[in-house]
């Protein structure tokens, strides 16, 4: 499609508005890459998808696609047998949660067949393959959620080994605190504060520097002023060593849990990739529906004979309170249309409306016009508006030149 015409007709502003209705980065990327098609059947397919999404929203309410993650790199790592990190597994879980939500939304229940509105399930058929293709992989998602509580925390019961190590860590930590509290109470006058602190992963006491020889142990740090030394008492060095060994064991157990979850996800890389692509596509289609509802649009009919009939068309970039609807027909009784009138009379807006509607329609977007409006599919759209002033500036071609 002619890039100058896209710019002149301010197609990019419509695309930017469309992008705001997508919930995910992947959906937004599809919005930004949208360009008009010159294939009549493809245009009709796109229009049907937008229409079906609008119908679903009207009958069932909106569905949220928030939570779709780009897991492409993670899937490549699974394909070569690598283990995934906690954030990567959580991204897979987030994607599957959205897939489950979308699949449930796309399912036709007995009481949602449109009987109250007189509409039937057949109205949704163009979206059926997309919803049907989603694989929520519920067992995998449930296992990830059971094992991983957040990006910073793996559940104690993620594995028997991890559960055992953490119980041992709690026992050891209790013993350390008991020992330190005893030392703290008997040496309170030597301490800067009656608190237990951590330095380099070791439990320490804050000792006044002038009493450093009164508390036997290893110095791990000192305060900025040098008045406080953080000393690990000799009495707990063995316990601190035990705790450090347990922490190493804990990390190994966590890595084993992540490896196990990765192995469980590995056989489903194709399903996960398909989920990601289908959800991005659905997010994109429902963004079109959101834009259509915002502008109170309708689905235009299409032909390949060059016929245009716009009924009460409203330019989408103009203030809806002041925009004057236009009626345009062209291509049946006559093929050439000359628009005349005084300066600031709306000629440029009318021409831009016809051009922009054509671009929007061929992109699968509904147009802000009455039902029954008709557009044609063109291989190219050309526009020469002279100064190419913005519609939103409300300037005529003449007054813009004068400016």
Report each predicted region and the residues it spans.
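Conserved amphipathic alpha-helical "coupling/scaffold" segments
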Residues: 1-151, 157, 161, 268-271, ...
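Amphipathic alpha-helical transducer elements in NTP-driven molecular machines
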Residues: 12, 44-47, 65-68, 96, ...
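Extended, charged coiled-coil "arm/hinge" scaffolds of SMC/Rad50-like chromosome-maintenance ATPases
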Residues: 136-152, 238-259
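Intracellular alpha-helical coupling/juxtamembrane segments of multi-pass membrane proteins
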Residues: 165, 169-172, 246, 250-285
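ATPase nucleotide-binding head domains, primarily ABC-like/P-loop NTPase cores
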Residues: 294-298, 303-403
């Amino acid at each position: 499609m002619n890039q100058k015409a896209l710019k002149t007709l301010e197609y990019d502003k419509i695309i930017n508005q469309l992008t705001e209705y997508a919930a995910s980065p992947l959906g937004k990327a599809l919005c930004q890459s949208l360009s008009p098609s010159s294939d009549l059947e493809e245009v009709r397919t796109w229009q049907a998808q937008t229409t079906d999404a609008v119908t679903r929203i009207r009958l069932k309410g909106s569905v949220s696609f928030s939570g779709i993650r780009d897991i492409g790199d993670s899937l490549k790592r699974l394909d070569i047998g690598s283990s995934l990190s906690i954030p990567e597994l959580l991204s897979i879980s987030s994607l599957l949660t959205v897939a489950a939500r979308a699949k449930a939304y796309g399912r036709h229940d007995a009481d949602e067949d449109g009987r109250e509105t007189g509409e039937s399930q057949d109205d949704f058929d163009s979206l059926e393959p997309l919803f049907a293709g989603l694989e929520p992989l519920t067992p995998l998602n449930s296992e990830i959620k059971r094992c991983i509580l957040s990006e910073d925390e793996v559940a104690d019961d993620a594995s028997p080994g991890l559960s055992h190590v953490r119980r041992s860590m709690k026992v050891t930590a209790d013993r350390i605190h008991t020992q330190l509290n005893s030392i703290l109470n008997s040496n309170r006058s030597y301490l800067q504060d009656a608190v237990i602190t951590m330095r380099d992963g070791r439990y320490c006491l804050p000792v006044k520097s002038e009493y450093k020889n009164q508390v036997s142990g290893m110095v791990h740090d000192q305060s900025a002023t040098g008045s406080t030394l953080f000393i690990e008492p000799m009495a707990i060095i063995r316990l601190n060593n035990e705790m450090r060994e347990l922490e190493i064991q804990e990390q190994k157990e966590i890595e084993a849990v992540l490896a196990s979850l990765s192995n469980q996800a590995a056989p489903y890389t194709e399903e996960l990739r398909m989920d990601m692509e289908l959800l991005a596509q659905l997010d994109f289609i429902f963004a079109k529906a959101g834009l259509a509802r915002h502008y109170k649009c309708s689905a235009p009919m299409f032909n390949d004979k060059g016929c245009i009939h716009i009924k009460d068309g409203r330019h989408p970039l103009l203030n809806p309170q002041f925009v004057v609807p236009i009626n345009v027909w062209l291509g049946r009784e006559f093929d050439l249309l000359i628009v005349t009138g005084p300066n600031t009379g709306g000629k440029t807006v009318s021409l831009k409306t016809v051009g922009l509607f054509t671009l929007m329609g061929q992109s699968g977007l509904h147009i802000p016009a009455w039902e029954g409006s008709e557009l044609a599919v063109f291989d190219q759209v050309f526009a020469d508006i002279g100064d190419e002033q913005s519609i939103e500036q409300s300037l005529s071609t003449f007054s813009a030149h004068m400016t």
